[in-house]
Amino acid sequence: MKGLRGHNKKSFWGNTRLSDLLWPVTLLPGLISAYQPVYLGSRQSSPFLPPQIPLGDSPPLSDTHEFTLRHIFHRGTYQDPDLHRRLDITPDTRLRAVSDAGIESDVVTPNTPLVASSQPLIIERLADRRLSVIEEHLVTARSSGSAVALSPSDWVMDTLPGPNVTEKKTVVALAMMTANDYIEVPGTGDWQDIHGRFNHSGSFGWQGDGLRGHVYADKTNSTVVISLKGTSPALFDGEGTTTNDKINDNLFFSCCCGQGGSYLWRQVCDCQTTLYNANLTCIVEAMLDENRYYRASLDLYSNITEMYPNANVWLTGHSLGGAVSSLLGLTFGVPVVTFEAVPEALPAARLGLPSPPGHDSRYPQSRRNTGSYHFGHTADPVYMGTCNGVSSVCTWGGYAMESACHTGQMCVYDTVEDKGWRVGLSKHRINYVIANVLAGYDDVPPCAPEEECYDCELWKFFRSNGSEITTTTSATSTSTSTTTSRTSTCKTPGWWGCLDQTTTTETTSTSTSTSTCKTPGWFGCKDPTTTSDITSVPTITTTEPPMTSTTTCKTPGWFGCKDETTTQVIAPAATLTITEPPVTSTTTGKHLGRF
């Protein structure tokens, strides 16, 4: 038996060739690739790739990260709507920093790392955050006029690594990312077109149009920060993105696109109907145009997350860039830290962003666990929502900044009380804020949600889809008239008037008007049909009988009869006559004009 076992073992190895042993190794690449993460809905041929849900190992919830600038994305909007380019930062790339005033500095090499730490953060967000699914929700909200109603199973409560907003170093590092606005020195950077539909060979000034995002990543690519460029500082239309930023500001943060307020405000839509009345459907249509910053931010986010599918994404921004970052954070459920951001609850409600069960989508400022934190100070009128008065610099610059409510939590430095500062727009610039507020305080302020805040309380908004039927019923009026008449000839005159019968007539009429509009217009109904029914109550006529008096005198005197005898006869009782009047119905007008 022992020999048999030894023979069989020897025979097995003896008949095996080397190629037979190596063939499983040739299958390893295929087996390994088969276990690569696969994302549903990926479109390799499309330039706009959906953001992915990482399927790999989760990064630690608390850690320290050293971020460096990796890419600059530029998404065209107005002038070049098909433009989407990317600049990869290499050791040979030379950049110029652009200051708050739009002045270019000397050549810099942005290789100094920015250190920030993370901590566990709970966010309630959609379970399926693919771009295609998000687009379906937005389309539904656009067509129905309200955010799509989702079941509780469509939402998850996730704990993920978020920025440590209680640490001063982290807050300052994120603010530095929003302050860093770079352009490349010609010849030192190679912009890559994400798709080939834009011919930039003869284009000049394309960097002055669109939305720009700076992408920072840590050493392990486990955490990525996207910083969006905010509003240009110039107050009057000029070069760069100033005009486009003003259009987006007035479209997103005004009650009605710069209408209904100061004549200095730049009007960016025509949706107001009457005083403090506006067509909300018209406003939302303008906000969702493809050349708006929110639409451009969706494309930026989707392409960046395609490059880093397993990374944890943070968003940050200043002013308009902070507001757009917050809208992105609410859309995809990622952490957001903004600085001096414009109050963005108003556009969040109008865009129809999905809201968890138990929250009213019309008031996104009431949501909890959004993962968004808005840092600012009380001397900044933009952040506080007060830069809209007649004498404010925003108004004189054409900006209609009427929104007042933030989503998420506000982290407010009370510089008016602590430092005695006066409110002014000069204190809105990010470099001033970093030097005098973020670095000037020893600790960061506590963060808390904004309570009892409402936007555009004087306004009334209505939605239209071309099929409304508006019915208006007028008030009912009742009139009573009393008419006293006499016979044309008095047959029995008396000392104090005629003794003939007196007729009293009372008439009561009720008028009801009902107007039905099948095709409403901007300034009234185009084809109302008005029906007036006049119904009169029965006429009541009372006839009083005449009084008959007979006098007989037997012994007349100087001043009258000395022995008069008076006999008084009263006619039968009064006669009551009731007359039923006809009911009159009148229909007028089928096609009224605009007014």
From Swiss-Prot:
Enzyme Commission no: 3.1.1.3
Recorded catalytic activity of this chain's protein: a triacylglycerol + H2O = a diacylglycerol + a fatty acid + H(+)
CDD domains membership: Lipase_3 (cd00519)
GO (cellular component) term, any one: multivesicular body membrane
Record-annotated membrane-spanning stretches: 21-41
Record: active site: S319
GO molecular function: phospholipase activity; triacylglycerol lipase activity
Residue ranges annotated as Cytoplasmic topological domain: 1-20
Membrane topology category: Single-pass type II membrane protein
Record's keyword terms, sorted: Autophagy, Endosome, Glycoprotein, Hydrolase, Lipid degradation, Lipid metabolism, Membrane, Signal-anchor, Transmembrane, Transmembrane helix
Class of this enzyme: hydrolase
Pfam family, one: Lipase_3
Disulfide bridge positions per record: none
Lumenal-side positions: 42-595
Major location category of this protein: membrane
Keyword Phosphoprotein included in the entry's annotation: no
Glycosites: N164, N199, N221, N279, N303, N465
GO BP annotations listed: multivesicular body membrane disassembly; neutral lipid catabolic process; pexophagy; phosphatidylserine catabolic process; piecemeal microautophagy of the nucleus; vacuolar protein processing
Xref: InterPro entries: AB_hydrolase_fold, ATG15_Lipase, Fungal_lipase-type
Subcellular location: Endosome, Multivesicular body membrane; Prevacuolar compartment membrane
Function, as annotated: Lipase which is essential for lysis of subvacuolar cytoplasm to vacuole targeted bodies and intravacuolar autophagic bodies. Involved in the lysis of intravacuolar multivesicular body (MVB) vesicles. The intravacuolar membrane disintegration by atg15 is critical to life span extension.
Family, similarity comment: Belongs to the AB hydrolase superfamily. Lipase family.
Oligomeric form and interacting partners: Binds to both phosphatidylinositol (PI) and phosphatidylinositol 3,5-bisphosphate (PIP2).
UniProt-recorded name of the protein: Putative lipase atg15
Species of origin: Aspergillus niger (strain ATCC MYA-4892 / CBS 513.88 / FGSC A1513)
Source organism phylogeny: Eukaryota, Fungi, Dikarya, Ascomycota, Pezizomycotina
